[in-house]
Amino acid sequence: MGKVAAKMKVMPQSPEVDLDELQDRLENSLPEGAKISRVDREDVAFGLIALFPTVIIPDEAGGTDTVEDAFSGVDGVESVDVDEVGRI
């Protein structure tokens, strides 16, 4: 079975959220078999910075749903969207 790289957009609840701590919480929330290969940061507006983790997951039914659900439940996360997906 192959693997998929999914670049996710994670918006913090406010500019006051510590992004390093948020990144650690995201890594700890990952479902089994998933791992973060890199995390980019991008200024959005008014001091708000979005995290763009690239998550490597098995290519199976459900795709990124389990990662999206896990990230959505993390304290300090306002929203989670899939930015890009590709097989590796």
Swiss-Prot record:
Gene3D superfamilies: 3.30.70.60. SMART domains: EF1_GNE. GO terms for molecular function: translation elongation factor activity. InterPro entries: eEF-1beta-like_sf, EF1B_bsu/dsu_GNE, Transl_elong_EF1B/ribsomal_bS6, Transl_elong_EF1B_B_arc. Signal peptide: none annotated. Keywords: Elongation factor, Protein biosynthesis. It holds the Pfam family EF1_GNE. HAMAP family: EF1_beta (MF_00043). Promotes the exchange of GDP for GTP in EF-1-alpha/GDP, thus allowing the regeneration of EF-1-alpha/GTP that could then be used to form the ternary complex EF-1-alpha/GTP/AAtRNA. Belongs to the EF-1-beta/EF-1-delta family. This is Elongation factor 1-beta. It comes from Natronomonas pharaonis (strain ATCC 35678 / DSM 2160 / CIP 103997 / JCM 8858 / NBRC 14720 / NCIMB 2260 / Gabara). The lineage of its organism: Archaea, Methanobacteriati, Methanobacteriota, Stenosarchaea group, Halobacteria.
